[in-house]
Amino acid sequence: MKFGGYFTKSVDDLKIDEELSKLIPENTMSDKIKNEIQKYGFLYPVIIDQNGFVIDGYTRVRIAKELGIKEVPVIVYIFDSPEERMRSAIQLNVIRRHLTHEQIEQLYQKYLSTGLSPKEAVKKLDKELKQENIRIKNLEPKMRAVEILQSEAPELFELLAKYQLDPQLLLQFYLSIKEFYDYFKQLPEEKKLEILRSERLLLQVEAEPALLKQFAEAEKFASSVTSVPTTEQEDNGDLESFYRGVDGNEEELIRSKEELNEALEQMGLGTEEEEAENQDEQLFSEFIEELKSGSVTAVPKSIEVYKKENGRLIKIEGEIYLKRKS
């Protein structure tokens, strides 16, 4: 199980796995939960898997729909197998609801549907729940950090969901600037991000579905652009001239350090290769956001293009990328 990020998501996009939901006893505190949501808002994020299926929060999702709530906070977890996903769902609900022994026994009985004998099911599930409990406890500080940010610093909570920041690090940042928070929250988003970047908080992004989706969209955009300027080197270009020419040669965006070094060697770039080896591997997420936003003012200050027979080496504000002919 791997942490995948915090987001806000449309209630209508949340999926229910009917088979998995059968393993979870009905919540007998629906009315109390509904009253709390009406009074305090949707404080506890729904936990979903990488495919958008609810792992924990069935009752809250149903209540949100009843109350006409359009979007709710979610935590994404990436599971390696259906078995891990099922164990986590059961354990999360055991912890959250403080189930009675009778309810836990019902879970054991439902686990028999996997084909194990009653004795084997009880023994196996009990062992796995104990192991899972250790991992689930690591989630509690993150959830607490999310709750504090959501109630005390909604402006930071918005950035948390939007940029998939580490909630515990962001909470530490909030506590350190709490005295000046009224000033901070009035700053434009660009200035807030500049401050977070200087504190290295924006570097805490973990791999998660939304980020992968961004890169898939960006790669699709990049592959639709089939050429760059034909000069051997073009300094301080702009976005329009960068994508000006069309020669019909489809190109593949190269992201991995290994692929980059191999292609540089094939292209015989010499000093550029040495420089590239010293560059940290970058995902250029900000550049992607600029492309997706369509902002004509968000043009990189410096674009250098080195055209070679097998492709083009591109330096955007000092960071090196490569587009190679397929």
Curated annotation (Swiss-Prot):
SUPFAM superfamilies: ParB/Sulfiredoxin (SSF110849)
InterPro entries (UniProt xref): ParB/Sulfiredoxin_dom, ParB/Sulfiredoxin_sf
Origin superkingdom: Viruses
CDD domains xref list: pNOB8_ParB_N_like
SMART domains: ParB
Pfam family, one: ParBc
The family this protein is said to belong to: Belongs to the ParB family.
Protein known as: Uncharacterized protein ORF326b
Source lineage: Viruses, Viruses incertae sedis, Bicaudaviridae, Bicaudavirus
